[in-house]
Swiss-Prot record:
The lineage of its organism: Bacteria, Pseudomonadati, Pseudomonadota, Alphaproteobacteria, Hyphomicrobiales. This is Cobyric acid synthase. Residues 254-442 form the GATase cobBQ-type domain. GO terms for molecular function: ABC-type vitamin B12 transporter activity; catalytic activity. It comes from the Bacteria. Belongs to the CobB/CobQ family. CobQ subfamily. Catalyzes amidations at positions B, D, E, and G on adenosylcobyrinic A,C-diamide. NH(2) groups are provided by glutamine, and one molecule of ATP is hydrogenolyzed for each amidation.
Length: 488
């Protein structure tokens, strides 16, 4: 029977995903059959499994760390935000429906059986299951019907380690405060804590660790310094985009790619391979910032709420900036939702993204998108055009796109379909397929279209090396043998 251990956080973006991924790799290298598990995830950054299901991208990365294909059971409940208060609901990889936050809070008690079923499925094929919580363990206002943190831990009898982030400050209060507000029954599930992202001399925080132990009654299991290798792994949360993507300009920078950040941004891990190119500078811009005229390429990436994001794009004034940029000879590429925005018209007759509506697109490609009930979720392969460079990737979208510019497709798939469109002058293009830039030959071919010589590195090898480095880093600062004794 497999053992399990759960890592919960004092908040979002404290490093849970990275630590679970690193532990997955560390224990896998010891010969254990390890599986990652996240009962409930809220993210628009998703991945497609081999059977055509959908899970959080972070769990796909953790599966890679374990050396196994991603499975829908690794993330049985995925909530994909569509508005400030509502989400699309994915259960065991399949679209189940949509609900407002108040509604799905009440629905969660019915999802516990699904969560426990998936958890058992993983336990049946593993020696160790490493479980990642969601958000904060101390959100006691959401404790009723909880399936993401302590609710799951108690239902499945899985011991918990609490992670605090010292980099954001107040880590003593983070962890001690968690103990203060949760119930004694929940607190009994906790077997210790980790302090993540420490910078400086660790001896200076020995007293801090003792104080956390004193106020919480939990044992300190490790002080983890900031891990530089984490930069080479995809960001899970949109809130981490700036930390991952906007760095200092390199002396090697030759090609500026500007990416507008919109509220419904999705599948932004498409950007990770590009940011590793020494000759590329990725510039993330947010509302209130103009679109730089010196951009070599404007890249519109995926969106979970294409119409709402198109409205936000216009409210930011970027439509005016983009039109002027194109008039001056600028180049634009759209991925998935960004591709849809480039067209002349977007129609949502069924009200899938809100009330039934029809909105004017950016008008840079002669095409129209109609949103339909059926969701396309499939792994694909083929070649880009006209260079005939092979690719593998996946489609994950709602809607069908057609129009005159589709006569000049960007991709040809092996199943006979064509995908994407290119303007007559070749300066505007887009497609639905995600994952293109993770293919080394395809990324090089894409950049070559703009006269940019790409590096000769392997993106997959960089990610693998980063996972190994994170595992080594954790092994230096955590007693992995002792941690294993805490699992049950």
């Amino acid at each position: 029977m497999a053992k399990a251990l759960m890592l919960q956080g004092t908040g979002s973006d404290v490093g849970k995903t990275l630590i679970v991924a690193g532990l997955c790799r560390a224990y896998m290298r010891r010969g254990l059959r390890v599986r990652p598990f996240k009962p409930q995830n809220m993210s628009n950054n998703a991945a497609v499994t081999l059977d055509g299901g959908e899970i959080g991208r972070a769990q796909a990365l953790q599966a890679q760390a374990c050396g196994v294909p991603p499975s829908v059971h690794m993330n049985p409940v995925l909530l994909k935000p569509q508005s400030g208060t509502g989400s699309q609901i994915i259960l065991q990889g399949r679209l189940s429906g949509q609900a407002e936050a108040r509604t799905y809070q009440a629905m969660k008690k019915h999802w516990l059986a699904i969560v426990l079923e998936s958890f058992q499925h993983l336990k049946d094929e593993a020696d160790l299951v490493l479980v990642e919580g969601a958000g904060s363990a101390s959100e006691i206002n959401l404790r009723a019907n909880d399936i993401a943190n302590m609710g799951f831990a108690r239902a499945a009898d899985v011991p918990v380690i609490v992670i605090g982030d010292i980099d954001r400050g107040g880590v003593i209060a983070q962890i001690a405060g968690t103990k203060l507000v949760i119930t004694p029954q929940d607190a009994e599930m906790v077997v210790g804590f980790l302090v993540n992202r420490f910078r400086g001399d660790p001896d200076l925080f020995k007293e801090g660790m003792r104080q956390i132990e004193h106020f919480s009654g939990w044992r300190g299991l490790g002080l983890i310094p900031h891990c530089p290798a984490a930069r080479d792994l995809p960001a899970e949360d949109a809130m981490a985009l700036g930390r991952h993507l906007n760095g200092e300009r390199s002396a090697h920078t030759k090609f500026k790619i500007v990416v507008p950040v919109l509220p419904g941004i999705a599948n932004f891990d498409d950007l990770d391979p590009l940011r590793m190119e020494r000759g590329v500078e990725l510039i993330m811009i947010r509302p209130g910032t103009y679109l730089p005229v010196e951009a070599d390429l404007v890249l519109l990436i995926g969106s979970k709420t294409t119409i709402a994001d198109l409205v936000a794009f216009r409210e930011a004034g970027w439509d005016v900036d983009l039109a002027a940029y194109v008039r001056r000879g600028g180049k634009v590429f759209g991925l998935c939702g960004g591709y849809q925005m480039l067209g002349e018209n977007l129609r949502d007759p069924l009200g899938l993204e809100g009330p039934p509506s029809e909105v004017r697109g950016l008008g840079l490609l002669a095409l129209e998108t109609v949103f339909t009930q059926e969701k396309t979720l499939v792994a694909v392969e083929g070649v880009s055009l006209p260079d005939e460079v092979p690719f593998t990737g996946f489609e994950m979208h709602v809607g069908h796109t057609s129009g005159d510019d589709c006569a000049r497709p960007f991709l040809r798939l092996t199943d006979g379909r064509q995908d994407g469109a290119v303007s007559k002058d070749g300066r505007i293009a887009g497609c639905y397929v995600h994952g293109l830039f993770g293919m080394d030959t395809q990324r090089r071919a894409f950049l070559a279209r703009f006269g940019v010589a790409a590096g000769d590195f392997s993106y997959l090898e960089k990610v693998e090396a980063a996972l190994d480095a994170v595992a080594d880093h954790l092994a230096q600062h955590i007693d992995l043998d002792h941690l294993l004794t805490l699992a049950r």
